[in-house]
Amino acid sequence: MLKNQSNSVHVDGSHNNSSNYNDEVSSIAKSIRNADESVNFITFNQDASCIALGLKNGYKIFNCKPNFGKCYQFKKNESIGKIEMLYCTSLIAIVGLGEEVGSSPRKLKIINTRRQSTICELIFPSTILQVKLSKSRMIILLEEQIYIYDVTTMKLLHTIETSPNGNGLCTLSADNCDGKNNSYLAYPSPPKTITHDSLLVNGINTNGGMNSIQNNIQSVSNSPNRIGDVIIFNTTTLQPLSVIEAHKSALAAITLSTDGTLLATASDKGTIVRVFSVATGLKLYQFRRGTYPTKIFTLSFSFDNKYVLATSSSGTVHIFRLGEEESLENKHKRKRNSKKLKLNPEYETITEENENEIQKDDAEDDDIIQDDGDDSDADDDDDESLEVIPSKHRKLSQDSNNSFTSFNSAFSNDDNKDNKSEPLIDQTRLSVARLIRRSSQTLGRKAAQKMGDFLPTRFSSILEPTRNFASLKINSVSKDIKSIAIINNEVQEDLVPQAYLNAKENNPSPPKDISVNTAKDLLPLNLLHINVVTSEGYFYTYGLDPDRGGDCILLHQYFLLD
C-alpha cells in the first residue's frame, strides 16, 4: 500500500475569485480530456470511507475519512470499466473495458491490492454491467442474468434470469447491519400481468433455489403492465421477498439503505423521488426533485436513514429529509385525495408521467411550478398505505421541509420567525431569476395551505409539492457530468465566510468576489459533510446545516487525476 500523500489540488471554494477559478478549472478540464487518466467509473465503498476510480490506464483509490488522501494507485495498460471495493480491505473486483488485447468486459478479476496478485478470474456469457460486494455476497449483473456468489469461497450460489436490464440497475444492502440480517438485493421487475385475481411476475426464473420455475411473489402492485416496479430478493435465503410498485415509467435509479429497511427510486423522468418500506412495500415519502425531466444518475441514503441524496445531469445534488414532518405532509395529501375519491368515484387524479412532455433541461433548480403527473399511481390508495415515521427520529424545524423556503425566508414578512431557523442562502448561487421563482412558489404554497381542502387534487398537488430540504450546485465545467454523492452522519464545525451567507436585499445578483481578510470574517457553523465525486475527476466536500437546510456550502475541492 502506498503512503497517504498530500493533496495536489486543494481549493477552498469560499475564498477564491470566481473568474480566476473558472479559468483555472476550464484549463484543467481541457487537459483532462486529452490525458491518459480519463475517468471511466467512480464509486464509494460500502461505508463511504474510500473512493475508487476506474481509469483509462488503471485505477486509483482515495481515502475520504477522516482525512482526504490517495492510498493506492495501480497503473497498467488496461482501461478499467468497473471497480468495486470490499469496505477498506485489500480485496477489490475490477472489470476491463475490453479495449486492449487480453481485456474483456465479460471478465471479472478479484485482486488483492496488498499482495498485488489476482485471486481469481471469472468469465461470463455477456458484458458485466454491475458488480456489488458485501461481507458475505458478491452480485454480478449482466443484461439478462444476475449471479450471486459467496464471497468467502467464490462459490456460485444462485442465478436469476431477468428481463433486459441494459442500464445495469441493481442495489445491495449491507449484511448483518446492527444485528439485522437484512441482506437484500433490489433490481427492476419484468412487466406484470393479472391472472385469476392474483399478480404473477413474468419471466423470473430462480435457478439453484427451491423454485426453479415462475415464482408467485408477494406484491403491492395493483396495475398490470407496469415497467417501473422493483423486486426485493433475499440474498441469504435466496428467495424473492416482494415486488414494490414504484413508478409506471422505466426506472432510472434505485438504492437500498445500508440496513436494508428502505428503498428509494426514481423514474426516467427524474422529477419524482419515492421512498418505500422494504418490509411492507408501502410508500413512506414522495418528493418532487424538479419540474422538467432530467437524468438522475444516483440515489443514496445517509447511514442513519435521515436523508436521501439525488445526483442528476442538471449538475445539482438534491437532499431530501426523511422526517416526521415530511411523512405527515405526504399523508395529509393522500387523505384529501381519498376523501375526494369517496365523494366522487369518477374523480380523476393526476395523470401518469407524460412521455411527450417538454424535454427541457433544468435551469438552476428546476423550480417552476408545473405538474408532471408522476404521482398518480399512488393517489388512489387508501390512507393506510402511508406510514408515519416515529417522532423519536428527530424534531424538525417549522417550514424546513420545502427547499424553496431556503431562498425567500430571508425576505419573509414574518417578524416572529427566528433568523437562526431560516435556511442558509448561498450568495454565489443567488440570481434574480431564482428569487422570482422562489417568491412565486412561496405564494403558491401559502395558497395551497389555505385552499388545499377546496381545490381539486390536480391543482393542490401542483401548488404544494414536498420538495428538497437542501441542495448544492456542482462546480463542473461541462454539462451532463456524471456524479455520485454521499452524506456523513457526523456533525463537524466549519468556518465559513460571513459574506458567503449574508443576504443583500437591495442587490440580489451574486457577488463576484468573496475574500477573507481576517479571522473575524469567518463564521463557525455546525455542518454535515456531503462528499461529491464527478467524472471530471474532482472531489468536493459541501457543508449542510442539519437544522436549517437550504444551500450547501462548498468547503473543499480536490483534483484526483494528478
From Swiss-Prot:
Residues 414-423 have a biased composition (Basic and acidic residues). This is Autophagy-related protein 18. It is found in: Preautophagosomal structure membrane; Vacuole membrane; Endosome membrane. One of its GO terms (cellular component) is phagophore. One of its GO terms (molecular function) is phosphatidylinositol-4-phosphate binding. A motif (L/FRRG motif) lies at residues 287-291. Belongs to the WD repeat PROPPIN family. InterPro entries: PROPPIN (IPR048720), WD40/YVTN_repeat-like_dom_sf (IPR015943), WD40_repeat_dom_sf (IPR036322), WD40_rpt (IPR001680). The N-terminus might form a beta-propeller domain involved in specific binding to phosphatidylinositol 3,5-bisphosphate (PIP2), leading to the association of the protein to the membrane. Residues 349-386 have a biased composition (Acidic residues). WD repeats lie at residues 246-286, 291-330. It is a peripheral membrane protein. Component of the PI(3,5)P2 regulatory complex. One of its GO terms (biological process) is pexophagy. The keyword Membrane applies. SUPFAM superfamilies: WD40 repeat-like (SSF50978). Residues 399-413 have a biased composition (Low complexity). Residues 1-22, 327-425 are annotated as: Disordered. The PI(3,5)P2 regulatory complex regulates both the synthesis and turnover of phosphatidylinositol 3,5-bisphosphate (PtdIns(3,5)P2). Necessary for proper vacuole morphology. Plays an important role in osmotically-induced vacuole fragmentation. Required for cytoplasm to vacuole transport (Cvt) vesicle formation, pexophagy and starvation-induced autophagy. Involved in correct ATG9 trafficking to the pre-autophagosomal structure. Might also be involved in premeiotic DNA replication. Keywords: Autophagy, Endosome, Membrane, Protein transport, Repeat, Transport, Vacuole, WD repeat.
